[in-house]
């Protein structure tokens, strides 16, 4: 294999506001959110290889199962692909903290594999099936996210935006939050 190495930060996703509008028949919730991507997050490196391999390092590596990782699921979206890659994730984004770490990781890996293999990105429909908020993570500009996360529009913003992120260490899986959300908690 040659010495090609592609790398990128995988930024956290911060919902500056998040309104849950209602629940759809398919179980997903319709959202309205303003999303920012501060320049902090995980680090991902990709090298050519014969197979798809994932290694995880970093202070949070023990909390993240390799086999069920969205990164590996994302790599399978390239249908009929015979290429491989060694993918290295340095995990810094807290898990189950509402910061979109898995979705951001998947988005970055999709972009890097597309570039490494010189193939088009999978369809947005396939990407949404993998994770509803992965499409918004494909571009780090300030965005308004609607629908289940698949309807995005860029927001013009000049200047700096300061955000303080605090994590008390409690895990709060997003799917559990939405599962326990009752209609009287929906935004008007």
Residues covered by each model-derived region:
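Short, ordered beta-strand-loop transition motifs
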Residues: 1-2, 49
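ATP-dependent small-molecule kinase catalytic core of the GHMP/sugar-kinase superfamily
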Residues: 2-36, 115-188
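Anion-binding (especially nucleotide phosphate/pyrophosphate-binding) glycine-rich loop
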Residues: 40-106, 113-124
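Generic hydrophobic alpha-helical membrane-span motif
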Residues: 107-108, 139
